[in-house]
Amino acid sequence: DEEGIIENMKSFINAFSWNKGFKQYFAVKATPNPYIMRLLQKLGVGADCSSLAELILCEKVGITGHDIMFTSNDTPYVEYKKALEMGAIINLDDITHIDYLENNHGSLPDTFCVRYNPGSLKEGGNTIIGLPEEAKYGMTREQIFEAYKQLQAKGVKHFGIHTMVVSNELDIDGLVGTAELCFNLAVDIKKELGITVEFIDLGGGVGVAYKPE
């Protein structure tokens, strides 16, 4: 099993070797196993966390800083606090959490990511996690522009965009379509706000073909 994990991950990372800024994050909730986390860490893979328990797992295996992407929903401050103490990238799910974080923590880190819900703009791909327009997660396009304005005014310097509208996706067109939505949004943000989106986080993951067909 270990050899298979290493071989597959090396192959996946190599497929994106043309992109010098590429970084793979492993969704800890998928398999919260510290041995697998250590194995992937040795290959340069970060951790995508969505709870305090997952952050603690990362801490135990030595994953810290921007090697952690903290993406959660309806998040209590105690979880944000732990993520901030570990230097994780905070991926904001809700625009109201900007003030919530500042009021509770007293200051904001210089890097933030925001979670984009494209609603009906999404085309193609599977619906394992449902339709975006019916989902509880993420911000609308208008909210993201407002969130960026607020964050910039509060001193944030580095910005990212995240979205997760597919899961275990086997259709290349669905994956490409999701990426295009985010990159087009980044271009519009640069044009309208003058803010450069430095990284784009495509959640959901490339699917695994469990059967030969």
Tell me the role of every PLM-derived stretch:
Residues 204-213:
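A conserved active-site cap/scaffold subdomain adjacent to cofactor or substrate pockets
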Residues 22-199, 208:
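Active-site-proximal beta-alpha core segment in soluble small-molecule metabolic enzymes
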